[in-house]
Amino acid sequence: SGIDGFTLGEKMQQSAERFGAVTELAEVYKVRLSGKIKTLDTSEGVFQGRTVVIATGASPRPLGVPGEEALTGKGVHYCAACDGAPYRGKTVAVVGGGNSAAADALALSRIAKKVYLIHRRDSLRATKVYHEPLMSAPNVEFCWNSTVSALLHDNRLTGLRLKDVNTGAEHDLACDGLFISVGRAPATELFQGELALDKSCYIMADESTRTSLPGVFAAGDVRTKALRQVVTAVSDGAVAVHYAEEYLAENR
């Protein structure tokens, strides 16, 4: 049987604590990272250290349609790679027009009976490499110039109401699952002005997880990277700890 993300995180935390890690629950209000000693101002006081590993993550951007939150996990999803398998032989929809939406639609087309790709414009923003495979997939249908105006449901998703952005006309579309891929928002507000961020506000860090400041490392979805999944985040955590230990050994 599978395991949900929350339970997996709990088990990882418990494992770390068995080896001596200390968990402090606090909200961080301000960070000062440029000095040799890094300082975090929090709801539970001030924490200081010579290294900091940032793993604040990133959240999928919601559509903002009524009922979206309640239906999350009940037909509404944000990750085709994570949640697509149960939709084998079923009808699904993907919302978005960028690379992640195109990749999700292409992946789902290999298992789903039908895939609707819904985009508010009349062409994809995704790179050309996705265009031909999607256009030639017999079970992929494009819904151009369309937005999702309502989620149809009976305790779980049963379909969508689509709105034509040009005419305002609406029609209903039956589907078993909806995959929302309209971007992600990294939790980096605290680090603006402290660390180098890319144009999408992800922390700029290479495969060593080093950031623009010595002694500061970024792991998981919050950093610049090609693939954001649990397995790559866990890998980042191990890498960040390795280089943090190395930094401490070299800067006693």
Name each model feature, range by range.
Residues 1-8:
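A short acidic, glycine-rich active-site loop
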Residues 96-98:
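Glycine-rich Rossmann-fold phosphate-binding loop(s) that bind the pyrophosphate
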Residues 59, 64, 69-86, 182-232, ...:
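FAD-site-proximal beta/loop scaffold in flavoenzymes
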Residues 10, 16-42, 46-49, 109-207, ...:
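A Rossmann-like FAD-binding core segment of flavoenzymes
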Residues 90-91:
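Residues that mark the start of a beta-strand
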Residues 105-106:
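Generic hydrophobic/aromatic pocket-lining and core-packing "Φ" positions
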Residues 101-102:
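N-terminal Rossmann-fold NAD(P) dinucleotide-binding loop
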